[in-house]
Every structure is written in C-alpha cells, then in structure tokens.
C-alpha cells in the first residue's frame, strides 16, 4: 500500500504541536536512521531522505534505541506513520511530513513460494492500517 511519510517525535518535542513538519523544520534536531547492518546499501534504506546531509545523525540497529533517542534527545525519524502504541504508549507521535513523496509498503515473495502463517498475519495487520490501499 502507499503511505505519505510522517515524522516520529516524542510527544513533548518542540515540533509536536505542528500539523505538518518540513525537512527544514527538522534541521536543528538529530535524525535517527535504522540500519540493518554495517554495510547496508543506501538503496535499501528504511527511511526516506536518509541520503540528505544533516548536521546530527545517529545510526542505530535496535528499534528500542530509536525510541530512547527520540525521548531523550528530541531526535526524530521519518517513516510511514505506523507506530504501534504498545512499543511506547502515548510517548511517540507521528506528524505528516510536508514533502511530496510516497512510501510503498509491501513484501517480496519468491514466485514458487506461498506465504506462511506469520507472513499472512503480517499482511492482515498491514491491511488494518491501509484498507483502502490493497
């Protein structure tokens, strides 16, 4: 499905009350990038705009660390806007990003393979967030 990018911030962040945030608004704050490994290619980055230079960047490979940095450093990350509340209650919010980009969220499956139960469960959960965008 397609999703507009959002900025994840802690609820008391100076930008949290804005209806829309621009990349320019984010410049004074540390950007958090999630990396899968030391040699990850920019082509497989999980965050939009990760190739845009910033003054402060923290690269993490632990999703819990992302939350802790958001809470402790007024840091941010850019993603789909989907953030399960069970990960940190009401402390993390998402604000739409004022950029003309679209994220495409889905999965890749070998043509000779069927989804297992975990994969089917994943798709069911995704569809709850985007029922109009199959």
Protein language model regions, located:
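Extended ligand-binding regions for polar small-molecule ligands
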Residues: 24, 104, 108-134
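Structural motif corresponding to alpha-helix initiation and N-cap regions
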Residues: 20, 60-63
């Amino acid at each position: 499905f397609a999703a507009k990018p959002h900025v994840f911030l802690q609820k008391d962040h100076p930008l949290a009350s804005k209806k829309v945030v621009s990349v320019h608004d984010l410049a004074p704050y540390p950007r958090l990038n999630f990396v899968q490994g030391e040699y990850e290619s920019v082509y497989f980055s999980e965050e939009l705009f990760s190739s845009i230079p910033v003054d402060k960047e923290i690269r993490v490979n632990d999703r819990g660390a992302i939350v802790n940095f958001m809470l402790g450093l007024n840091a941010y990350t850019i993603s789909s806007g989907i953030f399960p509340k069970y990960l940190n209650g009401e402390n993390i919010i998402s604000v739409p990003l004022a950029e003309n980009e679209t994220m495409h969220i889905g999965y890749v499956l070998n043509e000779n393979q069927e989804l297992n139960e975990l994969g089917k469960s994943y798709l069911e959960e995704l569809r709850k967030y985007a029922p109009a965008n199959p």
